[in-house]
Amino acid sequence: MLLIHELERIMEQHTERLIRLAFYYVRDLQSAEDIVQDVYIKFYDNQQNYEERGELKAYLSKLVSNRSKDYLRSWTYRKIQVQQKIFPQQTVMRRDMLVQQDERTLIENAILALPFKQREVIIHFYFEEMPVIDIAELLTIPESTVKTRLRRGRELLKLQLQHVEWEVLLHE
């Protein structure tokens, strides 16, 4: 049984990364934070089911990925999508508050615009720094499928970002 200070240490180590992962799935910071909080509660309540044969980082990432997918299928998410279509200005203002207007924002937006399957593997590969074999295992798909989704995702990103004059390159 985990002690509270052990759980706090785990949360300090993983929370920021897990929120970022959830955000890339659900595209909303508040929902991402809620998802991570739910995952920690589930992890604490069901810790006897956790087998320490794998990495805790991968286990928590899997929980966040699954919970994010559940959220995307939920009625709550669909209701928010309808509200954002009715009140689009609020969505734009909220997003501007969350993300800085720099090259990273352009890349993040391009990633968020990717189809779900490509976005999912791009996030795990580049942001979670997971090798292809681990992504395949996490998503229960063949390695070749992961590689194909990575290649297609990169191609789509290249198309989306080819018109950008990168500030960092202009000052070299």
Where are these regions (language model features)?
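A short, charge-rich alpha-helical start-of-domain segment used by transcription regulators
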Residues: M1-R20, V36, Y44
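Short, aromatic/basic-enriched loop-to-helix "N-cap" motif that marks the start
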Residues: Q48-K62, Y77-I80, E143
